[in-house]
Amino acid sequence: TNLSEARNLAIAKSTGEFNVKSKLFSGKEIYEISKKFRVYAKNKPSIYEYKLIKTYPHDIEAYTQGLEFINDTLYESTGQYGTSSLRKVDYKTGKVLKKLPINKSYFTEGITHYKDKIIQLTWKENIGFVYNRKTFELLDTFKYNKSPEGWGLCSDDNFLYKTDGSYKLWKIDPQTFEELESKDIVTHNNFISKVNELEYANGLIYANTCLLYTSPSPRDSSK
């Protein structure tokens, strides 16, 4: 396959960054050419306004990194070395109902829930924590096998989705925590990095950068 054919094939499949290698033969000599290129989304992203509906009290000392509603209960992950924690919060009053301090060697980041578990990321420590949702008992830990850092995290019924500070969104097996594949978060003219906390709703992932949403599918470049 030559570079032009490979590029056309990539464009037909998806957006993102691609690395294509081509081998050239001249007699007994073999030459290898590597070419990296980017494919952007076809359309500009939509820009939304918002309306502030209500405000709630919140601990001003909490260095919030992740938020997760389960029914009417708010779970929160706070960061900073020495003050990281996992919390259960009454969002109406701001009262912390349950708090698990994290070892000072970890800076905790995004959280999500999957079935009866809470999953919490660390920033640069290459480890994630799995807790019992009701008791906050630590059930398991896991390593990031491909991504360099832990930033945002969310889930649907089948997978976890994670960001790492780059423009990549990782799809993760919730049983093994293997990073299965990634998609690049792309607009019509830019790759969006530093995408942080995530929430999944109605088939879309809402991501905190300003605030954007993207399809979890690596082949859907329309969102």
Outline where the language-model segments fall.
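Conserved beta-strand positions in repeat-built beta-propeller and related beta-rich domains
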Residues: 76-80, 120-126, 162-166, 207-211
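Beta-rich, blade/repeat-based domains predominating
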Residues: 60-70, 104-114, 145-157, 189-203
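Conserved small/polar residues in nucleotide/adenosyl-binding loops
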Residues: 213-220
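Blade/loop signatures of beta-propeller domains
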Residues: 34-49, 82-87
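Surface-exposed, short loops/turns at beta-strand junctions within beta-sandwich domains
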Residues: 10-16
